[in-house]
A protein has these predicted regions:
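N-proximal low-complexity "stem/linker" segments adjacent to membrane-targeting elements
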Residues: 1-49
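Short, acidic, metal-binding catalytic loop of nucleotide-sugar glycosyltransferases
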Residues: 48-57
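A conserved acidic beta->alpha catalytic loop
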Residues: 49, 64-73, 114
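Glycine-rich, basic loop-to-helix element that forms the pyrophosphate-binding segment
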Residues: 85-102
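Short aromatic/hydrophobic "clamp" motif used to bind/position activated sugar donors
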Residues: 107
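Conserved donor NDP-sugar-binding/catalytic core segment of glycosyltransferases
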Residues: 119-150
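Acidic donor-binding loop at a coil-to-helix junction in glycosyltransferase catalytic cores
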Residues: 193-202
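Active-site-adjacent helix/loop segment of glycosyltransferases
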Residues: 211, 218-295
């Protein structure tokens, strides 16, 4: 499709969704699913913002993945229905269990450390009504814990979704995204903690659905308080996710799987800096550059570790397996 046609289509979808917001009925028939593991400090706020939607959800399900803290009790007190995993399922498996238990026509995934905009479900419903090809709706990600490491996590991991106009996406993080159940079909999450949302989005898109980014939806990420150690660990996990998804799926960056030596050029770092500069964040980009480079180094380490582990598994796998 030509760029001019794509731009026109984006504008038409955005205009139709704005009209539909005003005409939305006072019910969403959405099941909000929140996977949770040891999130007692943030889960109550996530549940409360889900219940406080201008278009109330049908239910809020918290899937407790063997927490060792008071997450279940806190979520119950906040008004959620808590379902406990009988064994460790990871974030992907917890979401699968939530989908199996949910009764809504819309499946709204929310992370346990997110405070969501009160118009989240209303705007998603409006987009679905305006364009039947839309399978999922995400929004603008905001760092809820300002500071060096919170900013670094936002820019390195979510720079694609921090601003801009309404547009089509190839994927969207499950920290706050609404899917139509009929668009999901048999798709399910890999039972892992990284890359599972990308695999899920790709499976839904393979069925013909499309993912819409609505910047009017505000997703406030109240992630754990990061320090240098946890920041490094998160970026290594992000590198693992990059390897696993690019190995299996046709996504931007697939060339890195085929030619990992290109990682030495730090391609993702330059993309992040370009997005920051395009949004006028010159001073912040310069201030954070050494830390952004360190985080990108950790991502490369994670990518290469996952690649090495994958190659070792292939070598050790018995013939015919």
């Amino acid at each position: 499709m030509r760029p001019a046609v794509q731009a026109s289509e984006r504008t038409q979808t955005a205009m139709r969704s704005e009209r539909a917001v005003a005409a939305s009925a006072p019910e969403s028939n959405a099941s909000v699913i929140i996977p949770c593991r040891n999130a007692a400090g943030t889960i109550a706020a996530a549940v409360r913002t889900a219940l406080a939607q201008s278009l109330p959800p049908l239910e809020v399900l918290v899937i407790d993945d063997e927490s060792t803290d008071d997450s279940s009790a806190v979520a119950t007190a906040a008004g959620a229905r808590v379902i406990r995993c009988e064994q460790r399922r990871n974030a992907g498996g917890a979401r699968n269990l939530g989908m199996a238990q949910a009764s809504g026509d819309l499946i709204a995934f929310l992370d346990a450390d997110v405070e969501i905009d009160a118009q989240w479900l209303a705007r998603a419903v409006a987009v679905f009504r305006s364009d039947s090809s839309v399978a999922a709706v995400g929004g603008r990600i905001i760092n809820g814990r300002p500071g060096r490491f919170g900013d670094l996590d936002l820019y390195l991991n979510h720079s694609e979704w921090i601003s801009g106009t309404g547009r089509w996406c190839t994927t969207f993080p499950t920290m706050a995204v609404v899917y139509r159940r009929d668009a999901i079909g048999p798709a399910h999450f890999p039972e892992t903690n990284y890359g599972e949302d990308t695999f899920f989005a790709h499976a839904v898109r393979a069925r013909g659905g499309r993912i819409w980014f609505d910047p009017a939806i505000r997703i406030v990420h109240m992630h754990e308080r990061l320090d240098a150690r946890t920041f490094w660990s998160r970026q290594i996990d992000a590198g693992r996710q990059l390897y696993l998804t690019r190995r299996a799926l046709k996504l931007p960056g697939k060339v890195l799987y085929r030619a990992p030596m290109l990682l030495a050029l730090y391609p993702h770092l330059w993309i992040v800096l370009y997005r920051m500069l395009r949004r006028g964040m010159v001073v912040k980009a310069l201030k954070l550059f050494p830390w952004l480079a360190a985080g990108e180094t950790a991502r490369i380490v994670g990518f290469l570790r996952a690649r090495r582990e994958s190659q070792r598994d292939i070598v050790m796998r018995p013939e015919g397996v």
